[in-house]
């Protein structure tokens, strides 16, 4: 008999520069979390990541954070510039809250699909 292959479940966490890991929700109930310079807004099509608006938020906004999807998971998120990212199982994406100047680069380990309002100068490093 063939084994049933189940799709990945929505699971991911943010790994902060300090090494702290914060689980991202998958409830779709529009909760908001404020973490180290960013606001995470749960939407039905993924978590929207926005820079916070306080001065302290802006001070850490240039730091890069990891979004990590463990093995067997999948996750959809929307970067601060509106780019949609579908991260597959066992993948990591590193991104800044603010892209500085014309450099719009993210770093990917694993597999992801990018879409939405991507501009031509968007770059994925591996």
Where are the regions a protein language model picked out?
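Short acidic/polar, Gly/Pro-enriched loop/turn segments located at secondary-structure boundaries
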Residues: 1-126
């Amino acid at each position: 008999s063939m084994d049933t292959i189940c799709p990945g479940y929505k699971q991911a966490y943010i790994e902060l520069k300090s090494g702290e890991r914060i689980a991202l929700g998958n409830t779709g109930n529009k909760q908001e979390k404020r973490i180290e310079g960013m606001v995470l807004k749960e939407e039905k099509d993924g978590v929207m990541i926005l820079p916070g608006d306080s001065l302290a938020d802006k001070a850490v906004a240039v730091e890069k954070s990891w979004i990590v999807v463990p093995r067997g998971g999948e996750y959809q998120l929307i970067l601060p510039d509106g780019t949609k990212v579908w991260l597959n199982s066992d993948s990591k994406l590193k991104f800044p809250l603010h892209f500085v100047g014309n450099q719009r680069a993210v770093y990917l380990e694993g597999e992801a699909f990018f879409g939405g309002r991507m501009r031509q100068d968007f770059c994925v490093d591996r």
